[in-house]
């Protein structure tokens, strides 16, 4: 038989195995707990590093930059040898020509000087001219002298001007002599500072040594070092830093704590020379001027009627002088007895000089020095012979290329008038971009009165019918002129007339029946019209003429608030007629607007086109 299993024996074996295994389980070592990292020490080191970094950064921020800006960076130049140019407090773009030194004398190209420093110099193709209140000085290129209007010669140790590489260049010493534009040279910074602003400005002395920097903040580059007591001009004040200009013209920022007491002070002229004074003649009362337009005679026969009607007028301006030819000769319709009668009536007489002769060339007349001299001499002699009180210059036909020559003529004429104690007034269009070349700012510096013609808003041979002088146009004309000219020198010119406009349907230019018409293609609706294509013409109408038209056609009037005038229209023979009425109502609003700017006067074009009621309105604003 085979072996049999013994359950009892088997149980004992299993029990024994179990007992043998249990001590192993009991004696097995428990795993060691993991050691905890020392987080406290590591965190402390990390925080310490951050603190050190912050402290270092703070220290860095507190350490002023010692880096100095290069002259190339400061002036935006590429050439290390080129000198930068500062005019008053502005860095100048010298693309028109940089300053340079020649035989120990500093020069500037004429274009750089003219557009950035002084446009009072004028080159006529033969000589460089400069006109002060009483004289015109002339320097020929390459010569070492200049002459005045009386022919007196002044010798210099340098050439006031000469040509270099085809460009006219002006000595800065001559600029200083003529224009009172002084200069300093900083060889360290390679800069030239030209200054001619003698107005009061905030200035102060520095309390400590310091640095002027390119921007506010000590980390910005240094422009220049400054010492205790140095005087600076404060250009802009900030909370902690201010923008200042140093005594060498450099501009930078310094901390406010370095500035002493700031006072408004004018810079003294370095060599003590008195600044030139452009004295002017001003009436003790508001100017109330009337233009008396004449064509073939003096107008003496009309003077009694004018005087009886124009109660309140104190200046009469007869249109007697016209430029006759390019050489500067004039046509003169004046009569001494006219002046005598006007004076007896308490009126000053300012004779008009105009350029209505279309055969003359403005560039020939005003651009040639000998022609200007002839014209000025002729006008001054004629005014003195007549016993008149002044000149009213009315030049309306020149183009922009004549602008500088015309301004030079005004300078020279003003000097001649100043010597003879004659009033000089100059008529101007309402300021617009295309008439900027009339340079009202320069006019305002040298003449007695600048007249703005606040009329011809819509004009002969213009493309659109409209008011001769809307209320808004009067305000705009006065505001823009006073922005360029001291208000006490401004005379606001107003119209005594309107225009009757005629619009006739047409297809082309060939439909014109006379030269007074202009063909207008208004297909795009740009203008206020009844027709897409039309011929437009107009004629000047007096206040009495307006009334006749209104009565003849039995017209009703509509008041236009935005224009400040009555308006009417009618159709006749296929044409559309329109009229913006000038009367005592529109004049009242215009006078109120003009006088609100406190100008030196008002003027009216033209006498004999007004009614008596108009002068009552005028006196309401001028008799104060």
Where are these regions (language model features)?
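Glycan-recognition patch characteristic of GH18 chitinases/ENGases
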Residues: 266-378
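N-terminal Lys/Arg-rich, disordered targeting/topogenic segments
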Residues: 1-43
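Short, acidic/polar
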Residues: 295-310, 367-385, 432-440, 582-595
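Substrate-binding surface in catalytic domains of secreted glycosidases
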Residues: 326-329, 333, 377, 400-546
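Glycan-binding loop/region signatures in secreted carbohydrate-active enzymes
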Residues: 273-274, 498-590, 622
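Conserved, mostly hydrophobic/aromatic
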Residues: 316, 393, 413, 450, ...
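Primary recognition of N-terminal secretory signal peptides and signal-anchoring hydrophobic helices
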Residues: 2-4, 38-238, 268-278, 282
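SH3/SH3-like beta-barrel fold
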Residues: 130, 229, 242-246, 254-255
């Amino acid at each position: 038989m085979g072996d049999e299993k013994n359950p009892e024996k088997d149980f004992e074996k299993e029990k024994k195995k179990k007992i043998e295994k249990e001590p192993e389980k009991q004696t097995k070592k428990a795993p060691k707990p993991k050691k905890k990292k020392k987080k406290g020490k590591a965190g402390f080191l990390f925080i310490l590093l951050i603190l050190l970094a912050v402290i270092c950064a703070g220290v860095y921020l507190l350490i002023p930059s010692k880096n100095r800006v290069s002259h190339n960076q400061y002036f935006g130049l590429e050439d290390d040898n080129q000198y930068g140019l500062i005019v008053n407090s502005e860095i100048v773009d010298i693309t028109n020509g940089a300053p340079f030194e020649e035989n120990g004398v500093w020069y500037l190209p004429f274009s750089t000087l003219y557009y950035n420093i002084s446009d009072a110099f004028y080159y006529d193709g033969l000589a460089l001219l400069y006109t002060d209140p009483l004289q015109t000085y002339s320097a020929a290129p390459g010569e070492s002298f200049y002459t005045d209007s009386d022919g007196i010669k002044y010798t210099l140790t340098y050439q006031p001007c000469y040509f270099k590489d085809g460009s006219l260049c002006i000595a800065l010493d001559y600029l200083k002599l003529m224009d009172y534009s002084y200069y300093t040279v900083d060889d360290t910074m390679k800069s030239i500072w030209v200054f001619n602003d003698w107005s009061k400005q905030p200035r102060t002395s520095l309390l400590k040594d310091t640095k002027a920097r390119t921007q506010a903040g000590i980390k910005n580059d240094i422009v220049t070092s400054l010492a205790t007591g140095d005087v600076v001009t404060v250009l802009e004040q900030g909370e902690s830093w201010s923008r200042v200009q140093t005594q060498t013209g450099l501009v930078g920022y310094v901390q406010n704590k370095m500035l002493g007491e700031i006072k408004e002070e004018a810079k003294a002229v370095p060599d003590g020379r008195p600044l030139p004074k452009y004295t002017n003649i001003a009436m003790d009362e508001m100017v109330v001027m009337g233009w008396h337009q004449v064509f073939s005679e003096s107008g003496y026969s009309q003077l009694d009627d004018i005087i009886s009607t124009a109660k309140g007028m104190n200046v009469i301006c007869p249109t007697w002088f016209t430029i006759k030819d390019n050489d500067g000769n004039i046509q003169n319709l004046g009569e001494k007895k006219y002046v005598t009668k006007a004076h007896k009536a308490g009126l000053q007489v300012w004779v008009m000089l105009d350029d209505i002769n279309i055969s003359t060339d403005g560039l020939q007349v005003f651009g040639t020095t000998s022609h200007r001299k002839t014209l000025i001499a002729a006008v001054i002699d004629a005014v003195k012979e007549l016993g008149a009180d002044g000149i009213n210059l009315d030049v309306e036909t020149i183009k922009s290329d004549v602008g500088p020559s015309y301004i030079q003529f005004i300078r020279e004429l003003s000097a001649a008038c100043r010597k003879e104690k004659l009033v000089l007034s100059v008529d101007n269009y309402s300021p617009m971009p295309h008439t900027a070349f009339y340079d009202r700012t320069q006019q305002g510096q040298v003449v007695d009165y600048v007249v703005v013609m606040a009329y011809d808003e819509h004009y002969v041979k213009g493309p659109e019918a409209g008011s001769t002088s809307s209320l808004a146009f009067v305000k705009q004309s006065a505001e823009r002129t006073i922005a360029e000219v001291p208000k006490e020198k401004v005379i606001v010119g107003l119209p005594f007339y309107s225009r009757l406009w005629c619009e006739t349907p047409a297809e082309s230019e060939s439909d014109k029946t006379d030269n007074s018409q202009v063909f207008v293609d208004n297909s795009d609706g740009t203008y206020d019209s009844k027709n897409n294509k039309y011929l437009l013409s107009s004629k000047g109408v007096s206040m009495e003429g307006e009334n006749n038209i209104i009565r003849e056609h039995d017209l009703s009037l509509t008041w236009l608030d935005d224009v400040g005038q009555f308006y009417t229209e009618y159709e006749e023979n296929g044409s559309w007629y329109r009229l913006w009425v000038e009367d005592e109502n529109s004049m009242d609003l215009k006078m109120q607007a003009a006088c609100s700017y406190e100008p030196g006067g008002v003027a009216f074009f033209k006498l004999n086109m007004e009614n008596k009621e108009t002068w009552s309105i005028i006196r309401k604003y001028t008799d104060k």
